[in-house]
Every structure is written in structure tokens, then in C-alpha cells.
Amino acid sequence: MKNHNVEVLAPAGSYDIMKAVINAGADAVYLGGDMFGARAYAGNLNKEEMIRALDYAHLRDKKIYLTVNTLLKENECTHELVDYIAPFYEAGLDACIVQDMGVFKILHSAFPDMHMHASTQMTITGEKGASILKEMGAMRIVTARELTLDEIRQIHEKCDIEIESFVHGALCYCYSGQCLLSSMNGTRSGNRGRCAQACRLDYSVVNNDKVINDSKSSYPLSPKDMCALDILPDIIDAGVYSMKIEGRMKNVTYAAGVTSIYRKYTDMYLENGRKGYHVSQEDKNMLLDIFNRGSFTSGYYNSEKGKNMMSLSRPNHMGVKALQVVKNDNGRILFKALTDINPQDVFEIDSDNAYTSGDSYKKGSTFTVNLSRKLPLYKDRIIYRMKNGSVTKEIAEKYASQAGTLKKPVNMLFTAECGKPMKLELEACNTKVSVFGAYAEIAGKQPATVESCIKNLSKLGNTDFTAGKITADIGTNVFVPVSILNDLRRKGIEKLTETILDKYRRQTVDESVYNVCKASSKDISVTVNDSIHDGKYSTSVYLKTKGQLKSYILSGLNNDNVYADFKLFDDDECRKNIKKLADSQNVTAALPYIITQSQNRIFGSLIENIRSCNIEMFLVRNLEEIGFLGNLGQKTGFVPKIVTDAGLYCWNSFSVLQLRDIILVCGCELTRITLPYELNYKEMNMVNYGVPTEFVAEGFVPVMISKQCVRKTYGLCDHNNGIIYLNNKRSGTYMVESVCSFCHSVMYSAKRIDVGYDSSLLEEINPDYIRKDYDNMHNETAWTGHYDVGVE
């Protein structure tokens, strides 16, 4: 074993669930407050509950991490953000989990001694991105769920930063932080904590104009949940410090039940090693009962992507096989129990009807129930249990009740000697305190005994402590009133509690912390060349295919900038044409949306091909690419010029500042940034970018970047780039492109953005560059995106 210091990190959507997961064995809990969290529809905690949660956790030597993992608009990066965090910081908040680079900059500047965790929404896929975040001040990264064990191991070995990775729960189809599917179907943005779960809808899969799926496989974007119990030792040995359980939207049964299982097996491995590590089928069955989407996978750690990772027939809880219909006599149903049945088990009959068990039945036994004759309960039909009454009851009693409350043992020493003040010393959580009472007097009739004093001191009731080792040193013939003993115990516990919490608490925030909110975009203008914009727009055109490249060259068009998609550089003829084009026009190489740790060699070859065409400007889509180009530039002496794409979010001035600093530190030059798809023109105008901007005025929006591939899921993988379509009756038809060289797929919006060069929106946004796809497609589904409306 390489890593003996690990953390079980549990989710909580409410104060009560927070208590339950700590009682169930969590070392730390991540939860959201009432602002800026990526689960806007979870219960979340208000200010008072959050401070109570911090105290509850700290008295038990546990940690609380606050999610501030949404993108913030310019008008939100104000005193309001600092005001929101300040009371939690003062109360000892252990860390903030952050997505927005601007929020990261503000909070790290305002509260430098508070740990910052880089959210999985930052799409961290390799050690270069991890190193950048460490340089920014991150104490921990939450890796993308898509990384393999070997990729995580390499990050651990090459970058000295804490690693947090998911081990259980729902998997997003898209790389977290790169999904615009919900947003582009309405106004609910996943980047604002309001994901509408469009990935869990049904779609027809269309290949060569033919629908190739049916009702049994109509959820092509819905992955099964992950359960990493079987490979937990491998995950720990790969360097994962914090094992994260997904589920801030889940109930207490899920959160506490799953936490208890991962506590059990983490301890089993740390105490007994691999030889003593064995996962029982009973515990796996319990997890399936709690929630599953048709069995589990171990995620991307060691699973091959494709059909086996997907829940194609159903996107929600599938339950477990529990009953078989033996006979239906006009509504009198004879069931056979396929597993042990408990009181309050709930069984799904159809979407509108369920049956709740009133008794216990052993596996293999039969029993009769009277149900509506209209229900589709035909012979041999299998009925699934959706709720296990026994598991629900057990978890509630163990972890969600007062009896299940985790308490720290407190040791006490009581001293009473005639003529001296009575004294009570208490010790817990590496903290010692003493309190004093009245002077001890000689007993008139009944002197105090050691046993009676210990008995009274042990009565800790509903405090946060339980009696540990309690001793009493009492002189001869000493009188100790019970009232004084009770008062000493009460004062002692109060003092001990406050002393423990004082170790976590910080000084009141000084007014100077608000100065960070005044930095704004004026600081950008000082350190980045001002945009020279005279009201005329420079034009960029995006060439994706070999045919488009040939057509563009033959057209004789001359744009201010030409984007050549990275796939073009794999072709000898394309490289020759691009090199020739670069002699007369500015050509920028558009890099892949995602590169992972294991793809460095392939990416290096791509950059060599690009550089052979005399190109030094790159459209980058992630931090890993910035780090790679920076390292390459330092080795070879050239300074890569960078255009950031929309997925490197710049929603506010501070994110621009942070991104600029990253690029400069990496030894690159920030040429311009691409404006976000999800801000409207008013919100964009609030940001003084201080660097040339580019606006995507025409084209399909990449709404999902996924390690999965629809073509592979449906048995069409030929290891060649290809196109397939998904159709949803409500939202339209989406094109999904397989990108085989970097093993991911890109799903594009059903509706095409087409603002038009004469649009009043362009005048309102006033960008330096406008970008369009070179495909000349104009269709009835074109719209202006969120540039006019925005997102919630």
C-alpha cells in the first residue's frame, strides 16, 4: 500500500443529511449553501445551518467543504461573494470547491489561508492542468471522472497536489464543465447549477437516415452509475487521497448508506491490505437496492467505454429483481419471492402504480396479494423492488436518529479536597480545559464517593460528547453537592466545546478583503495590450473538413483569420494546402476539445505537424493544452500565441485576469478570447475584457464533449471519424461526431446559431472578431442562441 492517509468524502443536500453521513463514517462532507452552488435544486443550507454544520463537524474532527462551483456573472463578483463566504471562513470553513477561475482568484486573494479545491467542473485531465492549478493556489484537484487509474497515477507522481476522485454515484455523459446541452435546450444551465438532465431523455439514433434503436435502447446518453468498491485498493494506490461519493440531490438513505459502505471497505484495506480485502455480495446488493441504473460499472478507471457502461433502457433507478408473478386469478396475485422481502418494501408495477409489502417473506416462498385486475401482472412477469424497507429503516436508526449520533469520548478528572476549589479537567480532540467550582467542605452526614461522582459526571445527555475515562480524586470526608457537580460538568463541556471550535475559527474578516473585488477589468487593460477596435469587425472562418479547405482555397476568399481544425493536420495533402494558405493569410490551428494524460505523445505529434506548417497561433480548449504549449515553447524558444475558446469560460473580469496570468506564466501570449455562449449581450458588456474578443456569430454549438461514443455504443465503431444523429421529439436533431484520434465525441446543438453580420446584436456586443463555420448552412432552426436571452 502506498497511500495510508485517505479520506471518505460524502455529499449532503441538507443539515440533517450532513449529520447522518458523518455518523455513517465520512471524514469530510461537501455541501452547498444558498448561493453559487452547482446543485441549485438541492435542499442546501442557509447561513445559520452552515455554521452549525461546521461546528458539528469540527467537534468530531471532520471537515466541511463548501461548493461554490458555478460560473459567476460580472455583477455577482462583488462584495456579495465575499460577504457570502466571510462568516463561514470565520467559523472555520475547511475549503471551497470552485469552478470559475475568477471566483478562484477572488476567494484565494480574499482568504489566502483557506484551502481551495479545483472542481471537476474545471475539466482536469492531466498533470499539466493540475500543475497550473497548483500554481494558482489550489490545494486539491477533483479529477475528471473520465481518467483511468494509470492517468491518475501519473498525475500523482508528477504533481504534488491532493487528488480527489469520484468512486460512487452518477456519471455525466459529458466531461463535467463542458456541457451546454441543458442550456441550449432552454435557459437552465449546468454551469449555474440548474441542469435539466437532458442526457437522461430518450433519443432515436439515426445512422444513414435509418433509426437503429428501439424502446429497449432509447437512452443513448444515460450512463450507469459507478461503484468502485472492487477496485478501491487500486484507486488508493494510484494516489487518490479523497474518495468522493456523488449525490447531493439524493436522500439520507442513499447518502448515509453509501457512506457507511465505503467507510467499511476503506478501513478494511488500510488495516488488512489486499490479502484481507474482500467485498461481500450482501453489501453490493444493498447498494443496488439503494440506487442503480441497471447494475454498476467501475466507471472509467478500468472499464471499456461503450454499451456495457450505458443504461440504454431506463435512465433512472431500476431497482432489483424481487418478485415473479406465478398466477393472476382476476386480481388475486400469487407472487414468488426472488429475494428476501421486508415490510415497507415498494415494488413498481408500472409508471403509475406500485405495491407496498406489509409483511416479510423469505426468498423462494410464495404469497398472495389482492391488486387491481387492470394491472399488467401477467404470468412469469418479473417485478422490481424500488425501495427496500429494511435497508431504509436500518440506515435511519443507525445514522439519522439521535441514538446514532457520533460523539467524541471525553476524559474527565474531578478533584475535591477540603479547603480548595473543586476542579474538573476535561480532555477530548487533543484539547484540555479546566473549570473550578466552590471550595470543598467537610461532609456533615454523607461524604461523596468516587462512584457517585463518576456516575453524575457521565450524564452527558444530548451534548456532543460521550463519557470516556472518568476518574475522581476525592479527599477524606468531603461533601460534593450534586448541583455543583452538574454545574461543573455543564461549564466544562461548554468550555471544552468552545476551545475545540476556537482552533478552527479565524479572525473577523477585515474590510481590506473587499479590495480584491475592486480589481476588475481595469487591471487587465494595464497589463494586456488594449484592443484596437475601430468599429469594424475582423473575420474568422472555421474549416473543419478536407473538402472545406479545398473549397476555401479555390474561392479566393481572404479572411483576417482562418481556423484549421486539428484533424486536417493528419493528412499530407491538407498540410501542404494549409502551409500554402498560411503564406498569405493568418492561420490558427484549432486544437482538440479534450486531451488526457495518456494522449501526450499523440498530442505532441499533432503539434509537430502544425508547426511544420509554420503556424504559431492556436485555438486552445483546455488547461492541459496551455500547459503543453508552454512547456514546448520553453524548450524550443518560440512563444505560442493563444486564442482561448468558449469552453475556457470568461464570464467575468476576474476569470479573464486569472486566465491571462496562467497563459503568461506558461510563457505563452494571449491573443484574444472567445466570448461565452451562455451570456447575453448585456452581461458581456459588463465585462471589460481588456483583450481582443471573438464572437461565434454562425455555427453549431458544441453542447457535449464525451469520452463515450454513440457509434461504439450501437456497434458501429470502425476506429474512423464518423457522424451519427440523435433525435428527440421535443428538442430536435443533434449531430454527434466521433473524434477517434483523441478518443472522444462531440455533440452539436440541434439549432444553429446565425446572428448575421448586420444584426443589432453584433453592434451591442461589439467584438473584435466574428467567427463562422465554413459550411454555408442556413436552416429554419437557426437562432441567436443566448446572446439575446441569457441563462438563469
Predicted segments with their positions:
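Short, conserved phosphate-binding/catalytic loop or strand-edge motifs used
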Residues: K128
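Active-site pocket-lining/capping segments in soluble small-molecule metabolic enzymes
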Residues: K2-I124, V142-S242, M249-E792
